Design a protein with these regions (language model features):
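Alpha-helical repeat scaffolds
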Residues: 94-102, 132-144, 169-176, 214-223, ...
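Flexible helix-coil transition and linker loops at the boundaries of alpha-helical arrays
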Residues: 66-69, 102-115, 129, 143, ...
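Catalytic-site signature of metal-activated, phosphate-bearing donor transferases
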Residues: 1-88, 92
């Protein structure tokens, strides 16, 4: 591991495992948002490392030894929950997280990432264990009271409501998560929200469509498509919004021209293939019409090859 810190005696890592940086002395660490100056990309852990049983047992033994000496250590109770959760032991993880929450101080620091992880993971394992909705919502309420600037609580709840088909609640949670992320930033918070932004906007678009709020649905879909023209889910939702609002094919093509480049063959093919998949003959006819003759021939040949099962060149 490369450590990007000055070698000074008051700046040290502490902890037998899950070590973290501390500054000794009364002043402590001064945190700042320097993400515009320096950012790190964590690519995650290899699957083999996650499945390493010997490492799991070593970590578990170290954590249990620390907790034997300090049973009310909320950080290590949280680590205990993480360790059980990574091994698929959700009930043991839930119990450890609940003990961690009970051992937390009344007031948490605004950048207390470990406590944020504990609450977030408690929400997730409780959802996996199909705990009663009222109990999960009570955990969420307590988490927000302790760490009101953390968007991950709202994000995790939004994802849960979405899976349950409770679209109004899901939209509310996702919008709240994004608002917090934009307001309070990502220093020691918002790791899940940040990683799920595109998925959240896709769900917001489709959720608002299901709720009949087409104006918001269109806005969310446009945000996604301006980032990625190939996002078929957002494009399908957008076209469905127009269809349900009785927008003509001509107006749809005109609107999509603000997002897609009609001089770019790749953009034109994306739109044509989606129109064909939706069975929208009117849009298919119009998107075929903006292809140049040679592009149309190449597209038809490629589609014929694909339908025959032969490999595309």
């Amino acid at each position: 591991m490369i450590r990007f810190f000055v070698n000074r005696p008051d700046l040290r890592y502490v902890g037998k495992i899950h070590e973290h940086l501390v500054r000794k002395g009364r002043s402590g660490l001064h945190l700042t948002d320097a993400t515009k100056q320096l950012a790190f990309l964590h690519t995650g852990y290899q699957e083999q490392e996650k499945k390493d049983k010997s490492k799991f047992e070593r970590n578990l033994n170290i954590i249990l030894e620390i907790l034997k000496q300090d049973p009310e250590n909320c950080d290590y109770l949280g680590y205990l929950g993480d360790t059980y959760s990574s091994d698929g032991k959700n009930e043991e993880a839930r119990d450890a997280y609940k003990k961690a929450v009970a051992a937390m101080p009344e007031k948490l620091g605004v950048y207390d990432q470990r406590s944020s992880y504990t609450y977030t993971n408690l929400l997730r394992v409780s959802q996996c264990l199909n705990e009663p909705e009222a109990e999960v919502e009570a955990i969420y309420k307590e988490a927000v009271e302790k760490l009101p600037k953390e968007p991950d609580f709202d994000c995790v709840m939004g994802e849960w409501y979405w899976r349950k088909g409770q679209y109004e609640k899901a939209v509310q949670m996702y919008e709240l998560a994004i608002a917090k992320l934009e307001t309070y930033g990502t220093v020691n918070r918002g790791i899940i929200t940040t990683s799920m932004l595109i998925q959240m906007y896709e769900c917001l678009g489709e959720g608002c469509r299901k709720l009949g709020d087409y104006q918001k649905a269109v806005r969310y879909c446009v945000i996604v498509l301006n980032t990625d023209h190939k996002d078929v889910d957002a494009l399908l939702t957008l076209i469905n919004c127009f269809a349900e609002s009785n927008v003509s094919a001509e107006e749809v093509v005109q609107f999509l021209g603000k997002i897609y480049d009609y001089s770019d063959i790749k953009d034109k093919v994306i739109l044509l293939r989606v129109a064909m998949a939706m069975g929208r003959k009117d849009l298919e006819r119009m998107f075929r019409g903006i292809l140049l003759p040679q592009e149309r021939e190449e597209f038809d040949a490629a589609m014929e090859t694909a339908q025959s099962g032969a490999p595309l060149s």
